[in-house]
């Protein structure tokens, strides 16, 4: 979508582009310098993710990331951009106690520069999604593999593989949309299920290991640049392999998402 004007994109901009069949390119971002590079390369949404616990802080999970740390990084990203849409994760423990507490914490993220908050959880979070969305806070719901639930889920594994699990995820998606979610992120689910859910919903879907039929795609920045420690997950493509600069790698990612060339078959489940 056109980012030539200095006006910051809105959820309406993204929804309109989605309705016209344009794919949405999303990357995580945690600082002003990378934010400026990613915006210039044409990324539509910068997700200030609690994944910073892994790739910035060197921790083994996202669970220790605090709200104050998220606010700091949202401010950094906001200062480095002018047009791109900014989404922020609500970290573990900041939205589960009550909708009222979630609202107070979400307000702090929005005041720091976020335009949307992302909440992990299925239909049990519908009340919180509704509470926030009715009070002016756009919400992206997150289902499938949820890193904040890693201990409950028994590790990082594909979700929705059985008929019952797939049905549960479809129900979650519909109930979260009904509750007012403006976007849905689906992580590590079979591609056919990602396509089914995308067709069921009227809101944009963002996939990470959820197939090419989603309205858009997201990757962790460090993964797509090939600089994360350890083996890259199956759903990741290292875009630095064929690029001579970070700017080119990110531009190639955006183009691949927009053209539907990423994810390819080998990146799906």
UniProtKB/Swiss-Prot annotation:
Tell me its cofactors.
Mg(2+)
- List the Gene3D superfamilies hit by this protein, alphabetically: Phosphoenolpyruvate-binding domains (3.20.20.60)
Enzyme category, top tier: transferase
Q: Which GO terms describe its cellular component?
A: cytoplasm
* Record keywords: Cytoplasm, Magnesium, Metal-binding, Pantothenate biosynthesis, Transferase
Pathway of action: Cofactor biosynthesis; (R)-pantothenate biosynthesis; (R)-pantoate from 3-methyl-2-oxobutanoate: step 1/2
Main location per the UniProt record: cytoplasm
| Entry's cofactor comment | Binds 1 Mg(2+) ion per subunit.
HAMAP family attached here? PanB
Q: Sorted alphabetically, which PANTHER family does this protein's record hold?
A: 3-METHYL-2-OXOBUTANOATE HYDROXYMETHYLTRANSFERASE
Protein name, UniProt field: 3-methyl-2-oxobutanoate hydroxymethyltransferase
Q: Which organism is it from?
A: Nitrosomonas europaea (strain ATCC 19718 / CIP 103999 / KCTC 2705 / NBRC 14298)
Q: Which gene encodes it?
A: panB
